[in-house]
């Protein structure tokens, strides 16, 4: 019996919509990353992007446990000397709530060209509306 290897152009990709309201950030991000990679499919192949498209709505209502709401820090560098910038979870959620889920999922994907291709299939929206109704996304329930 030969080992099956999926071809990139033969993979069937579905669209799923996830409601992030009252979901724990890490548990939500791991399931999203798993589905973006395609690990939930029988035809998963490590060197081929077999994942689905994921639309995340209500990103502003995602929660974190413990004291992370005040203590969790996000850092980035501007590229200039002394240009390290920091923001707490609380401030980032007020300023750009979609960035929180994007950063959490991006950190769980491979750091290579294939990982960037997987990341492009993630669509995050702060509110409950999204412009992807033409793709007829299926509702995806993620347990707590």
Swiss-Prot record:
What InterPro entries does the annotation carry? Ribosomal_uL13, Ribosomal_uL13_bac-type, Ribosomal_uL13_CS, Ribosomal_uL13_sf
GO cellular component, as recorded: cytosolic large ribosomal subunit
- Tell me which Gene Ontology terms the entry assigns under biological process: negative regulation of translation; translation
Q: Name one GO molecular function term.
A: structural constituent of ribosome
Keywords attached to this Swiss-Prot or TrEMBL record, sorted alphabetically, are:
Ribonucleoprotein, Ribosomal protein
Q: Which NCBIfam families match?
A: rplM_bact
Concerning PANTHER family, the annotation shows: LARGE RIBOSOMAL SUBUNIT PROTEIN UL13M, RIBOSOMAL PROTEIN L13
Which family does the record assign? Answer: Belongs to the universal ribosomal protein uL13 family.
Function, as annotated, reads: This protein is one of the early assembly proteins of the 50S ribosomal subunit, although it is not seen to bind rRNA by itself. It is important during the early stages of 50S assembly.
Oligomeric state and interaction partners are given as: Part of the 50S ribosomal subunit.
* Name by which UniProt lists this protein: Large ribosomal subunit protein uL13
- Gene that this polypeptide is encoded by: rplM
